[in-house]
């Protein structure tokens, strides 16, 4: 039987972690855990995630209605997007939403995390797309999020933040850490002249490692990024899924057919110009997040 009090303590611990790592400010962010098909624990609204204790945690049903909450506490207004994840992904046991500085800066700049630059990111995350903007606390966010749920375990929320989910609370939180670390490395490597991406053969090897590990969750191994026809990266020889065509900024082809994913979609001079603009754009957003001019 699930020990709810222990899970509440775990939620508080993760809340302290995301607060200590500057993934949230003030009362931002929210966390939820699935108990069963109709009972979920979630963080309350209007409370700093760094200072929660177990009695702060609320319980809701599959529609987000309150089952139990202590006086003075009510569920986060963002519980709607958590519920949509659980509805569409029965394998998911926990969802974490935060505003990590680097990942959120990419979300604000409209740049998905899709470049294969680090083994851990390729194995654990694959690509991290951007779900279209939705007004906070409305159904716009879950509605815009829904089409990504069958294929990804992490998304950036346009002009908002990041959302990760996995089989349990710790795994969902670790994905959030991975997303932020990936974003930071990508940003800083751009400052040093641009990241060196893995070639197709190395990507294939990393996908095979993931299969051998039997890692849970979805993984967009057959996703090929070609945002605006400019930055096309190596697809590992597997860039096909007709369903992916619904995602903005991506281009796909059939397995077994010629794939352009190992070719630059723009001349070197144009690519350099785009990289310079990218660095300037992200730097501006990061400085704003840090309160610097």
Give residue ranges: language-model regions:
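Glycine-rich flexible loops
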Residues: 1-293
């Amino acid at each position: 039987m699930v020990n709810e009090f222990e899970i509440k303590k775990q939620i508080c611990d993760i809340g302290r972690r995301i607060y200590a790592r500057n993934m949230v400010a003030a009362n931002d962010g929210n966390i939820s855990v699935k108990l069963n098909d109709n009972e979920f624990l979630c963080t309350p609204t209007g409370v700093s995630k760094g200072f929660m204790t177990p009695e702060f945690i609320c319980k809701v049903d599959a529609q987000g209605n309150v089952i139990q909450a202590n006086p003075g506490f009510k569920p986060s207004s963002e519980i709607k997007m958590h519920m949509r994840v659980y509805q569409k992904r029965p394998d998911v046991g926990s969802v974490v939403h935060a505003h990590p500085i680097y990942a959120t800066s990419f979300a604000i700049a409209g740049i998905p995390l899709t470049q294969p630059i680090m083994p851990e990111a390729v194995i654990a995350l694959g690509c991290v797309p951007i779900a279209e903007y939705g007004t906070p606390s409305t159904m716009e966010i879950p509605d815009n999020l829904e089409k990504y749920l069958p294929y990804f375990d992490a998304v950036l929320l346009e002009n908002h933040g990041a959302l990760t989910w996995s089989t349990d609370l710790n795994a969902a939180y670790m994905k959030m850490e991975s997303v932020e670390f990936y974003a930071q490395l990508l940003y800083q490597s751009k400052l040093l002249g641009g990241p060196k991406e893995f070639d197709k053969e190395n990507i294939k090897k990393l996908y095979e490692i993931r299969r051998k590990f039997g890692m849970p969750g979805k993984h967009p191994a057959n996703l090929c990024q070609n945002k605006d026809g400019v930055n096309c990266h190596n697809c590992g020889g597997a860039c096909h899924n007709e369903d992916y065509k619904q995602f903005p900024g991506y281009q796909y082809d059939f397995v077994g057919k010629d794939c352009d994913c190992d070719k630059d979609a723009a001349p070197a001079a144009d690519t350099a110009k785009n990289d310079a603009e990218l660095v300037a754009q992200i730097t501006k957003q990061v400085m704003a997040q840090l309160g610097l001019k």
